[in-house]
Amino acid sequence: MRVPSVTLPLLVGATALAACVSGAPVETGPPNVPEFKPAFAGQTRAEAVATRTPLQVTEIASGFDRPWAIAFLPDRRMLVTEKPTGHLFIVTADGRKSPPVAGIPPVDGRGQGGLLDVELGPDFATSRRIYWTYYEPREGGNGLTVARGRLIDGAQPRIENLQITFRMLPTMESTQHCGGRLVFAPDTTLFVVLGERSIMPGRKQAQDLGSHLGKVVRINPDGSVPRDNPFVNRPGVRPEIWSYGHRNILSAALDARNQLWVVEMGPRGGDELNLVQRAKDYGWPTIGYGEEYSGRPIHRSTQAPGMEQPVYYWDPVIAPSGLTIYSGPLFPEWRGNLLIGGLASQALIRLVLRNNRVVGEERLLTHLHSRIREVVQGPEGALYLLTDESNGKLLKITPR
């Protein structure tokens, strides 16, 4: 059901404008780990910036049980996943929801698991194939799985010709740090981001090239391994691996130069923005900028030879989920900016980049007091968000 829109002015008043001019950061609270210092200027607490365009927030639909992802169909309807139930819906522009799409396999919806991302295949116009990630119940535990199938439209939509194209290994019993975002590259290869399962045996495997845990992997649409992957034909190494040393990535997107950006959740402190490159080690759990939730240390250092530094980090954390790099016509001042959903921060986080460095940060939509799970740019240039709650909402953001 479509409801009346609510218009929210953003960062108005002398204080916000002064912050933009004075160089003060958005985050002014004390860090969790004050002894950890940035490796270079601007790596954290960038200067506050302010969007000049007033924003209008329109609720398109509600009643989702912890929705997780949005993908646009060519006719501007949306696919929306519901995490714990394993339901996939088709939603019209005016908020009408289909019955759950039939043929989605059972999910393990406990904790951070369930039905996660969904994307249209690169050949969707002819094949009608969609791809999705989910936590698959398995003997001995569970694990992230990539599936694809043909979407059959109609009064009772369904999936036909289901195929499993990738299974994260090893299987473990854990409901945390699932990862799960999908990103198709222009060459049709598919990046899949994978968490390290949170538990100690999994955490250690983020540095183990014989494990998929804590990795970004790259596969072909049918699940085969691209011949130019960096670890092909290396004994004992998973050939799908593209990069490693990650903790829990819930945000991933390509920019205009086809660079892969990810935002990953840190522990207590140390959320990271990383520019992912082939064969690189991003350090977890050897280095980082956070600590255990108990306050105990994790890392002896924030730097180590052969390990990449984050482009940016947050302490305290924002709890990032969802990422789009804006390229539309409705918000010219946002072009090339990263827009990140914030769960614990209950905000839409905007980062301004220059030469692959963060030069400005903004927290938007804090008036909503909502955990933002997903951020997607629509075909017309509007932003579409999902709120992470038992009565989750699909919101549309346009200029007022």
Where are these regions (language model features)?
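Acidic/polar, solvent-exposed loop segments in beta-strand-rich repeat domains
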Residues: 200-211
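Repeat-solenoid scaffold signature
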Residues: 237-272, 277
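Bacterial N-terminal signal peptides
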Residues: 9-19
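Acidic, Gly/Ser/Thr-rich repeat motifs that build Ca2+-stabilized beta-propeller blades
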Residues: 21-200, 251-254, 259-266, 316-354, ...
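Conserved blade-ending motifs and adjacent loop-strand segments that build the rim/top face
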Residues: 246, 359-379
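Bacterial N-terminal signal peptides that target proteins for export
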Residues: 1-10
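Beta-propeller blade signature
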Residues: 145-154, 209-221, 276-277
